[in-house]
Amino acid sequence: MRVAASTVLLGVASAASFQQQTQHVLSSGYERAQAGMKPLAEQFVDAAGKPIANIEEAFHGMTAEVKALWDEIKLLVPESAFNHSNWFTKPKPARRRHDWDHVVKGADVQKLWVQGESGEDHRQVDGKLADFNLRVKAVDPSKLGVDKVKQYSGYLDDEANDKHLFYWFFESRNDPKNDPVVLWLNGGPGCSSLTGLFLELGPSSIDKKLKVVNNEFSWNNNASVIFLDQPVNVGYSYSGNSVSNTIAAGKDVYALLSLFFHQFPEYAKQDFHIAGESYAGHYIPVFASEILSHKNRNINLKSILIGNGLTDGLTQYEHYRPMACGKGGYPAVLDESECRSMDNALPRCQSLIQNCYDSGSVWSCVPASIYCNNALIGPYQRTGQNVYDIRGKCEDSSNLCYSALGWISDYLNQQDVMDALGVEVSGYESCNFDINRNFLFQGDWMQPFHRLVPNILKEIPVLIYAGDADYICNWLGNQAWTEALEWPGKKNFNKASIKDLKLAGAEKEYGKVKASGNFTFMQVYQAGHMVPMDQPENSLDFLNRWLGGEWFAK
């Protein structure tokens, strides 16, 4: 079952309106977050463990308030959505290859011990790595022409759980022996990071004739970059099972990085940064927390960057109405009556999100996601305006408004491309809507992962940047949650001066920046959801300055 109007954010997903077919739009501490929640389908069992036949049986014993919430959801969601058999379609066929240049076994890495400064022995790399292996293929740059630099591709395998994550690494064009390493993540959830590679910030793009076009403003100009297809069953990644929450995905990413840097210690000594957009506003705080939770690690994490992310729904959802109604710097998309309707819906939405924050329960978080997205994203989406860029209409609803996504998919489905990269699945999809839906019904969408950020700020800098023409994860909401975040530096951050962002030698600014302590917020002008696509030169400028530590706490 594909939910009929889910929103996928190339980085964020939800169900904005179930009544009609529209454009697809893509805890207090880490220990609490790790506890997670059972997927909704797994909760449809009775006391004896027998599957519940339908949602009516699940209501037995619930409070009247909870039942009332779900009565509303039933009006929006087809009964089939709650049928566990519909939750996971058959995965694409995969064929294991054996012509790898390197295979790194997690069990071997886990056996390595070293002596600490005080003389005690400890494992060289913490974490449960025994079930993981990393396969590495040296990519011949001449075969694809994407870039001339050294490249590696391959899979992280979790053999115990039949999970295989695909990655593609590009060395820096400049000084790879000293330049930092960046992990790039798209969101969805369920969208491939190879869309970020070819649509936004990688060494090349793909034109309508499926030809490779060089990108002079690639993020690997001054950094080595890893593009990772995660969670499983996204892009070239595959599994016989599925991942439906952010916490589970974090364990896989930690294992991948640990084994990759073990195989390539020359990169492990460099500074490492995690960057991403949209639903990566969920992923990155969790992934960074997972890495930082391991004292003995070979991942030299120095900062995180989140672009147009969804991180604090309670704060961010308050700013859909202003953005849609002319308060975000662009003309109003909705009329006065629609804006009033959004005003009327907001208190209920905020109450539901607060319920989710307080309880962490699937039964609270799923209604919050569906109601709020229907009430606050749905009206905008039904206008046909691009949810990723308020400046224009959605021109290609079959490709998340961007025809280039279709060209990228066609290119990556060519057999010679898949062979050159060592791909094991039969084909490529830019976004997997099964994963999109499963994360929604896991209750993952409204989880308060922003609560992880204060502890991250104690150790490393955090950059939140936002293109000012995006609707779905708009700059107003991102600015608001950075100012609302409870952390020791809140007062100083909120009163920090706002400065112009300019290219060297330029008279006109391309954005604004505010920084205090380890926290930085940027507004980037004339850019939608995908800032590097809309403003390639400017995004490379702030990336290089960020990696150089310009706004880090001194």
UniProtKB/Swiss-Prot annotation:
It is found in: Vacuole. GO terms for molecular function: serine-type carboxypeptidase activity. Residues 1-17 form the signal peptide. The active site is at 278, 470, 529. Residues 18-137 form a propeptide. Its EC number is 3.4.16.5. Disulfide bonds join 191-431, 325-339, 349-372, 356-365, 394-401. One of its GO terms (biological process) is proteolysis. SUPFAM superfamilies: alpha/beta-Hydrolases (SSF53474). It is an enzyme of class 3 (hydrolase). Glycans are attached at residues 222, 518. Keywords: Carboxypeptidase, Disulfide bond, Glycoprotein, Hydrolase, Protease, Signal, Vacuole, Zymogen. Pfam families: Carbpep_Y_N (PF05388), Peptidase_S10 (PF00450). It catalyses: Release of a C-terminal amino acid with broad specificity. GO terms for cellular component: fungal-type vacuole. Vacuolar carboxypeptidase involved in degradation of small peptides. Digests preferentially peptides containing an aliphatic or hydrophobic residue in P1' position, as well as methionine, leucine or phenylalanine in P1 position of ester substrate. Belongs to the peptidase S10 family. This is Carboxypeptidase Y homolog A. It comes from Podospora anserina (strain S / ATCC MYA-4624 / DSM 980 / FGSC 10383) (Pleurage anserina).
